[in-house]
Amino acid sequence: MSNASQLQIPNAKLDPRGWLNAAAEDQGFLVVGIGPASIGSVYKDGLSTFLDNAFEGDMDWLRTTASKRMQPQNMWPDAKSAIVLGMNYGPDHNPMDNLSARTAGNISVYARGRDYHDVLKGKLKQLASQFSAKTGNAVKVFVDTAPLMEKPLAQQAGLGWQGKHTNLIDKDSGSFFFLGELYTDLPLPLDEEQTDHCGDCSRCMAA
């Protein structure tokens, strides 16, 4: 996906924000942000503390892939920017209403449709191809299958903040969205990192 086509535009003339927003919306993404390819120290420290306390339980892969999670550029040293995208999967009704039916099973909202890995990967690949055609730069696609700390990356890109229920929260759309990433070797203007707005609130945990 790194080969430029006849549509190539010089990098200096590319409006990454305007073009990315429009292209991402065309692919069905609700939000898009640009952050650094690296992980901030506060998130690295959080993972270290998590592992030091053996909170991973039987999830051994969290420990064996820790170095890549803390430094994503170990997987691609040329990476300069992380384009993080979110796709809404929220239902058109309150899913909590289903819990009132005590004798019926309840399937988590995210699992009621097609496998989101397949859906997002296909759309991200199309977006990556367009990006490479416009910039001539290389792009790599990630959808929850590589050892990336997606929620910290999303917070750094301004998409939201990680709530006490561990999911990413966006002020406008809540937590009902899947995350995907485009890593590129093109340095892009970064969005402002989102801050934690939870305070003393714990409604997500009570739910």
Where are these regions (language model features)?
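Cysteine-centered iron-sulfur cluster-binding motifs in ferredoxin-type domains/subunits
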Residues: 193-207
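Auxiliary alpha/beta "docking" domains used to position bulky ligands
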Residues: 1-197
